[in-house]
Amino acid sequence: QPYFNKMYETVSGMLAKSGTVRYPGKREKNPDEPCKKGVIVISSNRGLAGGYNSNVAKLITGQEDWKTEDVVVYAIGNKGREILERKGYTVKESYPEVIEEPAYAEAMLLSQKLLTSFAAGEIGEIYLAYTHFKNTVSHEPKLLKLLPVEYDAEAGASTEGADALMNFEPEDVEALDMIIPKYISSLIYGALMEAAASENGARMQAMDSATSNARSEERRVGKE
């Protein structure tokens, strides 16, 4: 987790210095065209995990300014895909097997597909919807914007002294062009690992709750 957090901070810091991201061969967007959002949605293939899957789906359905037709879903896990399909969202790709055994190679392949669509102008923004793992009993649904990367200008200014020590070879924009594919792949893989841990924790909590409720009901019936 610290590695992936540092990756995000580093790319954001570079953007604070360069001020933009220019991806190789990216087609200029027609201002009259809607900005389509490519969203990687990480859920599970099974139920019995409390609100784990529905909470991830709500990260998308709860965006009031997002039109259903402007969202393109890349689903990892069947449960999130099923919820979003019922809500009318377009699922372009589905990878139910990836969440069973998360691997960096799978994250890299998905990253390449997304960046190809981004460069072609088919999608204008890339998001990642997953469950952030805090500990075994605490998990937080999280929507992270991957591209275009947003950074805090004030935070960038506050670290100006540190940034001044950074030298880019080649130039910063060229460096970003090389880093962005690894940046996207790393964040997808990190989210997969966190989601897998969160799913296990959520399922344990759900089963513990079900067991506790069953015992309470057993005691109640026994008293009657």
Predicted regions mapped to residue ranges:
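C-terminal beta-strand-loop-alpha-helix "lid" module of Rossmann-like NAD(P)-dependent dehydrogenases
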Residues: 1-223
